[in-house]
């Protein structure tokens, strides 16, 4: 049961990344090392974020939810967009190629750094726990989130982007940056359970992805 549970969690967390890499055509471009470079950039950006948060936003120890403090902490996630832009600017090729390399490398690095050890240690335990299934599902949501964020960064950095599209792209980028903060606040205020919180995050991410996809198609069609 222990190895079976770990195998299920591992497959649920990692196989969608492998399938995305194969089905997106990145394997045909030999983009593996480009994804590795994106992962290294992720590590550097997260280190800078941790140093910044530890310096200017120490851990809140009060009993009341610090709304302003959490909002300011969430603003640091803008660094992720800057990092994604840096990765895409260093890769030559079509827009969809840049987006997938940056997003897949970024999301895979986050998966390895934040979920690999908990799955290896926890999912191999004697007792079954749903939280590791939830963690695996959440990793898939994160992959979609970073694909969406990369597409938004790619659109906003186009020098020939029509001014009519710019407000919509900026709004979607704002929602992407503060999505985690809004969801955390919503879960805290409504006292949602773990499954309800996961479902809410999946729905919000899905809506954001559909909106970004529609805008991306419009931008590509206009400039084609």
Curated annotation (Swiss-Prot):
MF terms (GO), sorted A to Z: ribosome binding
UniProt keyword terms in alphabetical order = Cell membrane, Disease variant, Endoplasmic reticulum, Intellectual disability, Membrane, Nucleus, Transmembrane, Transmembrane helix
Q: What is the effect of changing residue 7 to R?
A: In NEDFLPH; decreased stability
Q: How does it sit in the membrane?
A: Multi-pass membrane protein
Provide the membrane-side ranges marked Cytoplasmic in the record: 22-34, 89-98, 156-164, 217-224
Q: Which GO terms describe its cellular component?
A: endoplasmic reticulum membrane; multi-pass translocon complex; nuclear membrane; plasma membrane; protein-containing complex
Question: Which segments sit on the Lumenal face?
Answer: 59-66, 125-129, 188-194
Q: What is the annotated localization of this protein?
A: Endoplasmic reticulum membrane; Nucleus membrane; Cell membrane
Bilayer-crossing residues are: 1-21, 35-58, 67-88, 99-124, 130-155, 165-187, 195-216
Which biological process terms from the Gene Ontology are attached to this UniProt entry? multi-pass transmembrane protein insertion into ER membrane; protein localization to nuclear inner membrane
What is the annotated quaternary arrangement, including any partners? Component of the back of Sec61 (BOS) complex, composed of NCLN/Nicalin, NOMO (NOMO1, NOMO2 or NOMO3) and TMEM147. The BOS complex is part of the multi-pass translocon (MPT) complex, composed of three subcomplexes, the GEL complex (composed of RAB5IF/OPTI and TMCO1), the BOS complex (composed of NCLN/Nicalin, NOMO and TMEM147) and the PAT complex (composed of WDR83OS/Asterix and CCDC47). The MPT complex associates with the SEC61 complex. Interacts with CHRM3, CHRM1 and AVPR2. Interacts with LBR; promoting LBR localization to the nucleus inner membrane. Interacts with DHCR7.
Q: In UniProt terms, what function does this protein have?
A: Component of the multi-pass translocon (MPT) complex that mediates insertion of multi-pass membrane proteins into the lipid bilayer of membranes. The MPT complex takes over after the SEC61 complex: following membrane insertion of the first few transmembrane segments of proteins by the SEC61 complex, the MPT complex occludes the lateral gate of the SEC61 complex to promote insertion of subsequent transmembrane regions. Also acts as a negative regulator of CHRM3 function, most likely by interfering with its trafficking to the cell membrane.
What's the disease link here? Neurodevelopmental disorder with facial dysmorphism, absent language, and pseudo-Pelger-Huet anomaly: An autosomal recessive disorder with onset in infancy and characterized by global developmental delay, intellectual disability, dysmorphic facial features, coarse facies, and behavioral problems. Affected individuals may have variable findings on brain imaging, such as cortical atrophy, thin corpus callosum and enlarged ventricles. Laboratory studies show nuclear lobulation defects in a subset of neutrophils, indicating a pseudo-Pelger-Huet anomaly.
Q: Which family does it belong to?
A: Belongs to the TMEM147 family.
Q: What is this protein called?
A: BOS complex subunit TMEM147
Give the organism's phylogenetic lineage: Eukaryota, Metazoa, Chordata, Craniata, Vertebrata
Q: Which gene encodes it?
A: TMEM147
